[in-house]
């Protein structure tokens, strides 16, 4: 019996919407054949795949246990909840959404506290004055401990936060916080600011692979196909296709175009008739078109690319290396 590959996806909100849109752009349609309320799904274009809709935190824990092969979740949850994360899971690729920073934030009234070194001095003085350690409200206990230790800060104690962490200093349950933020507006509204060197982690949603999952040949092949689609879409997004034909188009001209505009010639060329297809970064398109016309091209056409499949599959190669080591 072939082992199905289990892909865990956030079960609600913007994370689910963004995850589904990401896979759709890669030509992989996430579907719920039994209805929108179902927490199991499929990929319409593939067999041997089961979609598990879970909370982002559940996805991290299931990846650690190996009950899912791949999962979409934030790096902050991976680093916080999985001990020795780099040995147990692999961040295959970032997905470009769910961006947020885990930060150390202190009251704006602490005008002399700009860095973690300043915080260390304040923490030592606070303990001497109050005969207790400074309290840090957070739900990122492991990330906080590791970051503070890396800066030599020891005179503090963690107050575990289950709710609105940013309000803890105002209500007197903590002196400062470690929390996740996107724009910083909520911190500012609560009279807090981030230390100059207080960014613990710049997080975003990632496609993550589990070492502990049952990576049968069937599961690996399904992963290869999924990652091939994702890599092809990522490759296509970096370029636009430029086509032209003119007698003066030769290898020397293409080399100059490569050096000046960062183009690649995916099919070689030019042909004997001077036809050439180039892939060009979007921000260099007009400059390249002007260059080609200057050298004799009458017409230069430009088109968007949906996918660029290559012999190499760097995302699958990354997975294979991780599973072998």
Swiss-Prot record:
GO MF annotation list: ATP binding; ATP phosphoribosyltransferase activity; magnesium ion binding
Reported cofactor(s): Mg(2+)
Listed PROSITE patterns: ATP_P_PHORIBOSYLTR
Enzyme Commission code(s) on record: 2.4.2.17
Subcellular location(s) of the protein: Cytoplasm
GO biological process, one term: L-histidine biosynthetic process
One Gene Ontology CC term in the entry: cytoplasm
Activity regulation comment: Feedback inhibited by histidine.
Pathway this chain belongs to: Amino-acid biosynthesis; L-histidine biosynthesis; L-histidine from 5-phospho-alpha-D-ribose 1-diphosphate: step 1/9
Superkingdom as given in the UniProt entry: Bacteria
Keywords of this entry: Amino-acid biosynthesis, ATP-binding, Cytoplasm, Glycosyltransferase, Histidine biosynthesis, Magnesium, Metal-binding, Nucleotide-binding, Transferase
Reactions the enzyme catalyzes: 1-(5-phospho-beta-D-ribosyl)-ATP + diphosphate = 5-phospho-alpha-D-ribose 1-diphosphate + ATP
Major site of localization recorded for this protein: cytoplasm
Annotated signal peptide: none
Gene3D superfamilies linked: Periplasmic binding protein-like II
Function comment: Catalyzes the condensation of ATP and 5-phosphoribose 1-diphosphate to form N'-(5'-phosphoribosyl)-ATP (PR-ATP). Has a crucial role in the pathway because the rate of histidine biosynthesis seems to be controlled primarily by regulation of HisG enzymatic activity.
PANTHER family recorded: ATP PHOSPHORIBOSYLTRANSFERASE, ATP PHOSPHORIBOSYLTRANSFERASE ATP-PRTASE
Entry similarity comment: Belongs to the ATP phosphoribosyltransferase family. Long subfamily.
Stated name of the protein: ATP phosphoribosyltransferase
């Amino acid at each position: 019996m072939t082992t199905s590959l289990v892909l865990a996806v956030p079960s609600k909100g913007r994370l689910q919407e963004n995850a589904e849109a990401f896979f759709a752009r890669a030509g992989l349609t996430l579907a719920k054949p039994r209805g929108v309320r179902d927490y199991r799904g499929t990929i319409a274009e593939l067999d041997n795949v089961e979609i598990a809709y879970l909370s982002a935190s559940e996805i991290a824990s299931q990846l650690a246990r190996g009950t899912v092969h791949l999962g979409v979740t934030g790096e902050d949850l991976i680093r916080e909840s999985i001990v020795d994360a780099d040995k147990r899971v692999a961040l295959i690729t970032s997905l470009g959404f769910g961006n947020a920073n885990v930060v150390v934030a202190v009251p704006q009234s602490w005008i002399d506290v700009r860095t973690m070194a300043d915080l260390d001095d304040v923490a030592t003085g606070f303990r001497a004055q109050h005969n207790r350690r400074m309290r840090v409200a957070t739900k990122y206990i492991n990330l906080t401990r590791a970051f503070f230790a890396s800066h030599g800060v020891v005179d503090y104690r963690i107050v575990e936060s289950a709710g609105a962490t940013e309000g803890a200093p105002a209500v007197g349950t903590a002196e400062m916080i470690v929390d996740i933020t996107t724009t910083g507006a909520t911190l500012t509204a609560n009279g807090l600011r981030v230390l100059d060197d207080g960014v613990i982690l710049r997080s975003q949603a990632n496609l993550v692979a589990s070492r502990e999952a049952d990576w049968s040949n069937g599961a690996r092949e399904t992963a290869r196909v999924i990652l091939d689609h994702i890599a092809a879409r990522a490759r296509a997004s970096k370029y636009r296709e430029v086509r032209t034909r003119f007698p003066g188009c030769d290898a020397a001209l293409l080399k100059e175009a490569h050096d000046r505009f960062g183009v690649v010639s995916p099919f070689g060329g030019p042909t004997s008739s001077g036809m050439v297809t180039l892939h060009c970064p979007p921000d260099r398109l007009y400059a390249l078109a002007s260059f080609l016309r200057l050298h004799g091209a009458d017409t230069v056409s430009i088109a968007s690319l949906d996918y660029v499949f290559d012999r190499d599959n760097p995302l699958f190669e990354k997975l294979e290396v991780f599973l072998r080591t």
